[in-house]
Amino acid sequence: MTAAWTPSLFGGGEPAPDPTVVPRRIVLDETSWVDLAPAWLTGADAWFDGIVAEAPWDQRRRRMYDPATGGSGTVMEPRLTCGWRVPEAPDPAPAVAEALTARYGVRFDRVSANYYRHGDDSVAWHGDRVRFTHEAPIVAIVSLGAPRRFGLRPVGGGPSTRLTVAGGDLLVMGGRCQHDWQHTVPKWPGAGPRVSVTFRHDDPGPRPSIS
């Protein structure tokens, strides 16, 4: 059974970044890190309601290889997606991108969203494709709606890191995280609906660093 989503006591009002919230940095290795800032966005409930109702959601097909048969086929991704260039994105995405740019020193110009409708929606272990074009991409995620688990694991094997992100939380992956680590949003029985709004940048970005 899917749990109903309950609005946060702190999620009302107009959506806006809270400049007083300072992210906590989690060092994954010598060149990879994650920043976590709970309640970074005020008014998260209003953004959740608006983006769920108005975004041009699409459920994409993904080609999958079957090692047992040697064949391939397509499956529906277990989530809905959409995306914009930042100038065309609905509010408050441009203001959020501006706040992230001021903090991380790169111009965030693309925004995408994943809608996890219930606990059976998920995304498998992966590194973002931006790793093919950027040495140290910064990927910033604003979470809206119900809490969900977020996992990270090193590509070469080793202990994983498990986090829980709630509505209004900011999670940022930086350094060589997309190259040397994978991340996932696993299935979570009973979880309510959640949207992740992800900001990326086309410019080269910084050199790998944990500072």
Predicted segments — roles?
Residues 1-211:
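Non-heme Fe(II) oxygenase metal-center motifs and adjacent flexible, charged/small-residue loops
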